[in-house]
Amino acid sequence: EIKDNSKLFLQKIAQILVKYKYNVIEIEGHTDNIPISNSKYEDNRSLSSERARSVYEYVVSQEHFIDSNIKIAGYGDSRPVASNETEEGRAKNRRVAIKIYNKQNSNN
C-alpha cells in the first residue's frame, strides 16, 4: 500500500514517466536483509515484489501508459545500495527504483 506522504511524489514521477511511455520502464522493489516476520509475505522477495507492484498500480492509475512497456521485479535483499549493518543503511535498502530503458535496447 502506498503511504499518503508518497502519493504526491509518485504523481510527479508519473507525470515525468508519461514522457517515456514508449520506452521500457522497469519498477524494481528492494528490501533490507532482515527477514520479514509477518504472515502477509512469505519472504523478502515477495515483499519487494509487492512494493514494485503497488508503485506500478499507483503510477499507471495516474497517467495512461502502455502496460506492456512496464515491467515489475522484486529483488528482495539481493541488490543493496548501502550496508545492512546500520539502521540508516537498511532504510536506504528498503526502496523502489524506477529505470527507463531505450526500447530498442533494453539492456541500457
Language model features by range: what are they?
Residues 1-20, 30-108:
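Periplasmic OmpA-like peptidoglycan-binding domain that tethers envelope proteins to the cell wall
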